[in-house]
């Protein structure tokens, strides 16, 4: 057992196993899993609605926890994870500020429908300084923008698995004890806590389904920014 697993940080395990990545089963109707890492998801909805919760929802929840008790929360990239986290944050009584691609009026309207108090383009500044911001879009150029948007002592959380290179920026954006953090995977505790609050928060999961043999079409739609909510593949 590695040091991270002993410390309850199995999300940083030196020898991790991931279904669909290091282990087969990501698109299977049945798979074998270690029961210690399986979550009870009864009563959370139909299979299509639950699917985004098991990826975007879980990493979204961990990034929200890492963002801390931010009253004014910015979300950069209003996709699968963003639209779930926005609802949870609004349910918790936070003020959500949603940032989308420039000109994506549909996504901005969608964010307002889900409880955002403000929605605009990612290159716009929010009307008020943020306590924290979470970046879901894999665009490194958003990091300086998010740092500029948060108050002194605020946090910027990079929640993606990968991100394009972060451009250089003046130290003044990070100064005054702003924090820049990343998120990697999740722990069992994250999953247990998340699925406890899902029924309470009354989440509305927006999905668009694609047959498995149209997976490349789903990726193309995602890249083009033509999807509201989450894409779900059905075998």
Model-derived features: where do they sit?
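NAD(P)H dinucleotide-binding glycine-rich loop of Rossmann-like/cofactor-binding domains
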Residues: 1-76
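Structural detector of well-ordered beta-strand residues that form the stable sheet scaffold
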Residues: 39, 74, 97, 155-157, ...
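Mid-domain Rossmann-like dinucleotide-binding core that forms the NAD(H)/NADP(H) cofactor-binding site
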Residues: 43-123
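Short beta-strand/turn micro-motifs composed of small residues
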Residues: 77, 100, 137, 160, ...
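Glycine-rich cofactor phosphate-binding loops and adjacent beta1-alpha1 units
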Residues: 97, 105-179
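C-terminal hydrophobic helical "lid"/dimerization subdomain
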Residues: 144, 188-235
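Short strand-turn motif at the edge of the Rossmann-like AdoMet-binding core
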Residues: 159-163, 183-186, 210
């Amino acid at each position: 057992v590695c040091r991270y697993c002993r410390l309850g940080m199995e999300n940083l395990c030196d020898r991790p196993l991931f279904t669909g990545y290091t282990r087969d089963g990501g698109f299977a109707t049945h798979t074998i899993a270690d029961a210690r890492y399986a979550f009870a998801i009864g009563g959370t909805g139909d299979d299509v609605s639950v699917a985004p919760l098991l990826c975007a929802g879980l990493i979204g929840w961990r990034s929200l926890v890492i963002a801390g008790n931010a009253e004014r929360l910015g979300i950069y990239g209003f996709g699968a994870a963003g639209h779930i986290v926005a609802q949870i944050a609004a349910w918790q009584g936070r003020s959500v500020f949603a940032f989308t691609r420039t000109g994506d009026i549909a996504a901005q309207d969608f964010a307002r429908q889900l409880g955002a108090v403000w929605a605009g383009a990612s290159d716009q500044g929010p009307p008020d300084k943020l306590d924290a911001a979470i970046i879901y879009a894999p665009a490194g150029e958003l990091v300086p923008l998010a740092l500029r948007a948060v108050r002194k002592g605020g946090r910027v959380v990079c929640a993606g698995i990968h991100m394009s290179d972060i451009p250089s920026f003046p130290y003044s954006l990070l100064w005054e004890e702003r924090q820049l953090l990343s998120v990697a995977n999740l722990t069992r505790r994250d999953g247990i806590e998340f699925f406890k609050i899902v029924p309470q928060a009354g989440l509305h999961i927006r999905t668009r389904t694609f047959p498995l043999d149209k997976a490349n079409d789903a990726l193309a739609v995602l890249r083009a920014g033509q999807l509201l909510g989450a894409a779900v593949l059905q075998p």
